[in-house]
Amino acid sequence: MVKPFVFQVAGYQNRGKTTFIKKLMENLRELNVDVAVLKHHGHGGKPDIAKLKDSHNHFHAGAVASLVEGDGTMELLGNFSAGASITELIHLLELFHPDVILIEGYKQEDFPKVILIKEESDLLLLEGLVNVKAAVAWPKCLERTRKQASVPVFPLDSNQFFDWFLEQILGWHNARSIAINKIVEEDQ
């Protein structure tokens, strides 16, 4: 199995990360790229979980995990008593065999990332985070971001980032394919 391309979308709260990921996912799905998403609940505390069906009732009654599956679709609720590392969560998503895993949040992690710049105060992230590969800026911050950034900067209201992102995925997958082909040839 080829490991998925892992990429983060980072930025402060209320900067449009979820909307940005949704648009990126829609574009990738049009190209038959399978995407999984890992979202960090950065609002403090546990995420809200609706009490809708039996699986939720099992979970709220004390099950350490509750999984419901039907017709190939599943929903999993779980409590990691010691917390789960981002690596463990990525491994869980890898079970679905995605081509790409998009991570929303987890700013301090060392995966390649794009930063969303909506306010001038967001520019601090360009220097404060590791493995920043690109920035996407709102119109009012675009020129200032371009002057300050040492990475490619794209306007929010264009497809330029998506085109750049596809090149990153294709380059990554091509490099992996070359390495895999070399291993196969050596085994023969």
Where are the regions a protein language model picked out?
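Short loop/helix-cap segments at secondary-structure boundaries that form the rim of catalytic
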Residues: 108-111, 124-130, 142-150
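Walker A (P-loop) phosphate-binding motif
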Residues: 1-43
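Short, hydrophobic beta-strand segments that form beta-sheet elements in well-ordered domains
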Residues: 101-103, 113-118, 132-140
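Phosphate-binding/switch loop-helix module in NTP-utilizing enzymes
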Residues: 78-108
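N-terminal phosphate/diphosphate-binding loop that engages ATP/GTP or pyrophosphate donors
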Residues: 25-81
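Charged helix-capping and loop-helix junction motifs
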Residues: 51-53, 83-87, 120-121
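Short glycine-rich anion-binding loops that position phosphate/pyrophosphate groups of nucleotides
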Residues: 43, 73, 106-108, 119-121
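C-terminal accessory "lid"/substrate-recognition subdomains
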Residues: 95-99, 149-188
